[in-house]
Amino acid sequence: MNCLLELAIARQLLDSRDFFFLQIGAFDGETRDPLYQAVRKYGLSGVLVEPQQPAFKRLRENYKDQPQLQFVNAAISDRNEERIMYTRRDGNCTAASFDKQHLLKHSIPEEDIIAQPTPCLTFQELLKRSGREHVDLLQIDAEGADFAILKMVDFEHFRPSIVRYEQLHMSRSERDEVARRLVQNGYQLHADRMDVTAIQRAA
């Protein structure tokens, strides 16, 4: 687990006994997952979102002993609708995307790629279904869709204590736009090549 993220979670737990997270792009909950250890160590409550059926089944199985978790089998988009998502034929794909080119860039042979009809929810609909007005941690790893999802979030009114997202597939202008919005809304950013962890500054 990312050391900075774990420290941020542990610190937030001191202030919030009702810690709650949203994880968009949870995959199977275990493979290179930044929250798996913390969920088990602290018994964190939250909603885990994963659009791929095979991965979603493994996700629920891997967390079957964690009754405080909710699971949503959907992708996050700008409308509540069904869209085509591209994934591997064998169902084991950490690079699933609405953009077929994203998989090809990951050296997945075209003959191994299938188009899968996928239910989609807006970010606001996801929040509504979670039943929460405040979220302590927003974790996003959406294989190139992180920027589009972050654009849906109104950080002036929805302010998680911690925001973590993947910046690897963003353009320079997209990285700068997200960083600017977060800084303007009181976050301190800690970035590496792949990810950004944004922590709300103390009032």
What are the roles of these predicted feature ranges?
Residues M1-A203:
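Phosphate/nucleotide-binding beta-alpha loop and adjacent structural elements of enzyme active sites
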